């Protein structure tokens, strides 16, 4: 099944929700970055969360960056989404290995770290991007995203994210959900949301059995009459290009370029999101220098 996001609202208008199936884009990220299982799980969760958050943005060209710095061995976990839910991302240390937790699951929280911050940057093409930062709640990603919405945007939110890694280290299933209460939601609504989540069980297991994100949404919101608003295909998508890299080199300024030509002759730059390598010869750099 192709990766996609489904958005819905309850018939009484009190709950809005999204769910994503993201196995393919998570597997693509694994292949690009050569992540080991715990890094695959952490990055996969971040990509799924950022995709659902980015897809909700209004305005062509808007983007959302989700950055997690937890002080753990993975280093920074970063995911960037456009306003259609297409994502790219990386972890600083993709080769991290940790023992499984006592329950046999990957120790994502241990790899991410428990002491640090989650930052969301929304670039809506206004004068300044919106930036919201919270202290991590545990480093498991889903609860931290929910905490961000509660603390920074005052929106009561439940988030579930899961990545199931197969024996050969490929991604078996991945995805999640984001459920948010609208103003005026009652205590009864909260109880129904919490009850549905508890009854449904782990996200990765649900998606392994049935990869349809609409069915995931209906499983965790079984006590609600849902109206499906839209279905959006999503993918792992990098926007790098040689032209963008050239602009980045030009932005270094004359002095830096002259030094690069003198000391290195040329340079080789790789995209941190997709690992595409861009080679610039001495002549290429001299051409860029002449354009200044």
State what each model feature region is.
Residues 1-230:
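Interaction interfaces in information-processing and related assembly proteins
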Residues 198-292:
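Cys/His-clustered metal-coordination modules, chiefly Zn-binding fingers
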């Amino acid at each position: 099944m192709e990766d996609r996001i489904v958005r819905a609202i309850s018939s009484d208008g009190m709950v809005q929700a999204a769910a994503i199936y993201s196995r393919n884009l998570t597997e693509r990220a694994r292949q690009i970055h050569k992540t080991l299982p715990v890094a695959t799980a952490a990055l996969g969760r971040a990509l799924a969360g950022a995709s659902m958050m980015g897809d909700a943005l209004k305005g062509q060209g808007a983007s959302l960056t989700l950055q997690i710095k937890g002080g753990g061995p993975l280093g920074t976990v970063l995911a960037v989404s456009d306003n259609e839910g297409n994502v790219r991302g990386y972890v600083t240390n993709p080769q991290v290995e940790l023992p499984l937790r006592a329950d046999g699951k990957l120790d994502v929280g241990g790899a991410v770290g428990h002491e640090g911050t989650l930052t969301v940057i929304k670039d809506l093409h206004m004068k300044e991007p919106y930036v919201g930062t919270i202290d991590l709640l545990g480093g498991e990603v889903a609860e931290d995203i929910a905490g961000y919405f509660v603390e920074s945007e005052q929106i009561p939110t439940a988030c579930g994210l899961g990545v199931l890694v197969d024996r050969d280290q490929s991604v078996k299933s991945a995805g999640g959900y984001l459920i948010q209460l609208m103003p005026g939601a009652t205590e009864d609504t909260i109880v129904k949301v919490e009850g549905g989540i508890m009854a449904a069980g782990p996200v990765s297991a649900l998606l392994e059995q049935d990869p349809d994100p609409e069915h995931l949404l209906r499983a965790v919101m079984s006590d609600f009459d849902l109206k499906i608003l839209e279905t959006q295909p999503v993918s792992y998508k990098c926007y790098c290009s040689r032209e963008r890299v050239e602009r980045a080199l030009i932005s270094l300024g004359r002095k830096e370029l002259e030094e690069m030509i003198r000391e290195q002759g040329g340079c080789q730059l790789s995209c941190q999101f997709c690992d595409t390598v861009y080679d610039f010869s001495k002549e290429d750099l001299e051409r860029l220098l002449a354009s200044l």
